[in-house]
Amino acid sequence: MSYLVLARKWRPQSFDDLVGQEHVSRTLGNAIAQDRVAHAFLFTGVRGVGKTTSARILAKALNCLSSDGPTASPCLVCAACKEIAAGVDVDVQEIDGASHTGVDDVRRIQESLPYRPARDRHKILIVDEVHMLSGNAWNAFLKTLEEPPAHVKFIFATTEVHKVPITILSRCQRFDFKMISAQRIAERVRYILGEEKIVADEAAVQLVAREAAGSMRDALSILDQCIAFGGASLVGDEVARVLGVADRAALHALASAVVEGHADQALSQIDALARGGFDLGHVARDLLRRFRDLAVARVVPEPEPLLDLADAELADVKTLAARTNPDDLARIFTGLSKMLDDIATAGTPRHTLEIACVRLARRPPLLPIDDLLARLESLERRLGPGGGGGGGGARPGGENPGGDRKSVV
């Protein structure tokens, strides 16, 4: 039997399983309970956050055969629920908008809509990547979408909602799917690892959650890759190696060198990372994120909820942050942000990263405002009320018996 990837094996089958989209689950569940289900829905959001999954769950909720009508909690065991989950229900069509872009495709779909469902309660059309439809295809859809048969429901999903015509948007209930927080992704990853009987340290879990960038599907794809490498045990350093992410200790050493002004150590760390085969563009992004974490740890009394870090890494960040000035961290962050823009167009990312780290490590110190005010007051006292140092200014006729004037810096 072929292997079923984690993203498919652990795909949510009910609204209760859906992670990070409670606003969608609650709204749809209440609409079903109150018998206020619209005829057309538009799900929008970045990849891997649950749009198509939610469309299938909604289809099961509307067509579940174990209840007398639509239910917010489908049974998952009746023929309709099983066939919808497998994508073989004859009354639930799931098509890819990228491969059905023309008017003829839409017309073929429309021809089947007036007929009653073969078995289910509703005939449901799920169109993924719906923004790929042509303008003429959308125009052909308009009338049907505005006044569909009572037994027909449309569910559209897209990652680029700005490409969907406003005339279509106005005919649909729109749901915006949020990016999933690293904390929620980490919770789900821990649960799946437990069910799969795989041991992983906290650094590995946090790294997977962080690299997923808000996408649960990406997180499970990354996890599959890491399990293939590490087997039944995952360690943070090994996960970092698989993903091409800089080792946490090396990244912390680089950040410390920049903060403490050791340009030579910063260059040595960059050289070690380059020799290790790490993507220095990725290293630069991780370094920028590290200084964000340092700033948060410096200004927030209890920063743990805002930092997706393992305990050991969190302790290192808090220790380094305690030795820095918030304004200094902001200055370094600004410099690194500009460096990322430069790396995007640079032919040699390593050189750009090296020079940026040297410049930031050799930054002039920030003087406290009290020291600046004290220096200004001292200068004013020396110059005196007449601005000439207590009568020592130039005499009429341009004479200056005191020799060369002293310049004030």
Residue ranges and their predicted role:
Residues 24, 76-90, 105-114, 121, ...:
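Extended, largely alpha-helical regulatory/partner-binding modules appended to the mid-to-C-terminal parts
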Residues 51, 403-407:
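Short, compositionally biased segments
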